[in-house]
């Protein structure tokens, strides 16, 4: 892979344009008789394009998405629970959608068609993959304000108590230390009983606060009430709106309309999923080069234009939106906050013990640092990666029920991984990150895609046409590497030819020879 690190930006752009051509091979140009054709021509005129395929950033779903299913008067048949159990996917039914429901969503954007091309001709071609994170940790898991304020106070209190115990013990005379040890030995069973009772209460508290997710059937810890957490989400929403108030795209912008219709279609196709129909989903598109997206627990969807410029087609964007919606539906924010509170409580106990046992403050500070890093890398980050993998699985199923090409989901992460290699970013171990690595996410989705394809069939989605985008991506990468090797070989050959040019050799004439000639003359 050392070849990749020396690539010039022009060659990187050429590869990325080749990746974007994958979308062109699967794009659909509607015939003149299609009712969608005038709307598409209006969008192309808005962007100064002649055909749909000129915009490489976001493309149309060929005969599989919202409008074609509406115009063809197709309905999805129901998925029985028995069929769902055989597939091993979501155990609810495919939603029966009438044309009137979809047309109502289409009427809201009569000025500009919903599935519009969402990038301008000036969209940057290079993907800055390293900064991409779906549902950043701070954005996806708001922590209750009271605990945010009390968290440093709790740590300070634990340090003061532990250090006070140590100073008290060091100040005791030797005879009193022996008396205290004898008292502990005499009452060891009472102390053991007290610790056992505390442990039993902790276990009872833990299991009484477990809830089963209605979507996945997985048990999860919830210490924060849903209503309380929704209130905190509203407060966080106000903070984000204040921050992005000058960067939000207007509602008539084609990129905003595209995302809005995709979110509407995803939620309508999955409104039988617990938590989707009860939530009011509101879209906000932030004009920022950051490659990011997140959904608050109260249904506020934030997506950045940098992400719109990074996806190859609408299929990839549909999966990413499904991933973020899955975070909100599964209650990952409340679950992560609950785990943080539990670990903070246990951490206070260990922190008090560290400051009480360590003989010096410097050793206590070192022990506190080790304890925080162990908590972070053994509990926090692995749990975050688990939640991300679960959101990938459920998001893929949501996209499958919306009749997107689920095969494009793994292609997106392959693109991100290859883009990082092209830019020369170091590959960090996965255990250092809150998210799975791009390569592992692509492999995980590849294992889930067969089930998602079966779910598409059960939901009566149109069959997928054209070659597999994963195969096209691999061929594009292979061709790009071959071209790069040829270019490097040509540069090497030219350099060798230049070095092999005959040079006039200047011979040094000895000084004695010159003197002899002059003497003889």
Swiss-Prot record:
Protein name: Metalloendopeptidase OMA1, mitochondrial
Domain notes: The stress-sensor region regulates proteolysis and activation.
Phenotypic effect of disruption: Mice develop normally with males and females being fertile. They however display transcriptional changes in genes of lipid and glucose metabolic pathways and substantial alterations in circulating blood parameters. Moreover, mice exhibit an increase in body weight due to increased adipose mass, hepatic steatosis, decreased energy expenditure and impaired thermogenenesis. Mice are protected against heart failure by averting cardiomyocyte death in different murine heart failure models.
Functional note: Metalloprotease that is part of the quality control system in the inner membrane of mitochondria. Activated in response to various mitochondrial stress, leading to the proteolytic cleavage of target proteins, such as OPA1, UQCC3 and DELE1. Involved in the fusion of the mitochondrial inner membranes by mediating cleavage of OPA1 at S1 position, generating the soluble OPA1 (S-OPA1), which cooperates with the membrane form (L-OPA1) to coordinate the fusion of mitochondrial inner membranes.
Keyword list, A-Z: Autocatalytic cleavage, Disulfide bond, Hydrolase, Lipid-binding, Membrane, Metal-binding, Metalloprotease, Mitochondrion, Mitochondrion inner membrane, Protease, Transit peptide, Transmembrane, Transmembrane helix, Zinc, Zymogen
Cardiolipin-binding: annotated span: 144-163
InterPro entries cross-referenced by the UniProt entry: Mito/Outer_Membr_Metalloprot (IPR051156), Peptidase_M48 (IPR001915)
Keyword Transit peptide in annotation: yes
GO function term, MF aspect, one: lipid binding
Summary of activators and inhibitors of this protein: Protease activity is activated upon autocatalytic cleavage in response to mitochondrial depolarization.
Residues at the active site: 324
Record note on quaternary structure: Homooligomer.
Pfam family, one: Peptidase_M48
Membrane topology according to the record: Single-pass membrane protein
Cofactor: Zn(2+)
CC terms in the record's Gene Ontology section: mitochondrial inner membrane; mitochondrial intermembrane space; mitochondrion
The protein's Enzyme Commission number: 3.4.24.-
PTM per Swiss-Prot/TrEMBL: Autocatalytically cleaved in response to mitochondrial depolarization both at the N-terminus and C-terminus to generate the short active form (S-OMA1). Autocatalytic processing at the C-terminus takes place at residues 443-452. The S-OMA1 form is unstable. OMA1 pre-processing by AFG3L2 may participate in maturation before OMA1 autocatalytic cleavage. Degraded by YMEL1 in response to membrane depolarization. Protein turnover is regulated by prohibitin (PHB and PHB2), which promotes degradation of OMA1 in a cardiolipin-binding manner. May form a redox-dependent disulfide bond. Exists in a semi-oxidized state and is activated by prolonged hypoxia.
Gene name of this polypeptide: Oma1
Cofactor: how and how many bound: Binds 1 zinc ion per subunit.
GO BP: cristae formation; diet induced thermogenesis; energy homeostasis; glucose metabolic process; HRI-mediated signaling; integrated stress response signaling; lipid metabolic process; mitochondrial protein processing
Domain of life of the organism encoding this protein: Eukaryota
Disulfide bond annotation, renumbered to this chain: 403-461
CDD domains assigned to the protein according to its UniProt record, in alphabetical order: M48C_Oma1_like (cd07331)
